[in-house]
């Protein structure tokens, strides 16, 4: 069982959540894949710098993992080899981006992900025939 929390809640909140969660594994949300400009939110850091700060908080708090763009995989791995990484914004080769800004194709994801990385694929599967869409996404990785 997993529960997502915002890593921007800072260290004390993350630790309190971890304590309260019991056997539920916590995943810390870093920067949303739909965000491309943090300055609009009053955050002066670049996306990479903000992701780094939030992953370091998740790691320090001993969360089970993070939810972060697949574009951040190497950055997350440079901080922790043990965190699980759930990556939304995964698309088939020719899928629409919709509101997502920081995406990666499933083919590229499979080349860069390790055994603790998980693709999160939503709209590219549920828009239309889900079975056919899953087949198309998987076939696009060959």
Model-found features: residue ranges?
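Conserved anion-binding
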Residues: 1-74, 78-84, 90-97
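Glycine-rich phosphate-binding active-site loops on the catalytic face of alpha/beta enzymes
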Residues: 2-13, 90-95, 99-134
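Catalytic-site microenvironment of enzymes
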Residues: 20, 127, 132-142
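A generic structural signal for ordered secondary structure
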Residues: 22-28, 118-120, 137-141
């Amino acid at each position: 069982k997993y529960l997502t929390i915002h890593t921007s809640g800072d260290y004390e909140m993350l630790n309190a959540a971890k304590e309260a969660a019991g056997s539920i594994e916590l995943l810390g949300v870093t920067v949303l894949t739909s965000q491309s400009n943090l300055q609009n939110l009053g955050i002066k850091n670049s996306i990479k710098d903000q992701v780094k700060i939030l992953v370091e908080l998740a790691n320090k708090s001993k969360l089970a993992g993070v939810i972060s763009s697949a574009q951040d995989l190497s950055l997350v791995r440079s901080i922790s080899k043990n965190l699980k990484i759930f990556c939304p914004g995964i698309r088939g080769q020719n899928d629409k981006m919709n509101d997502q800004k920081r995406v990666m194709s499933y083919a590229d994801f499979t080349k860069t992900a390790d055994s603790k990385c998980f693709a999160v694929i939503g709209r590219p599967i549920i828009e239309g025939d889900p079975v056919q869409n899953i087949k198309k996404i998987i076939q696009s990785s060959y």
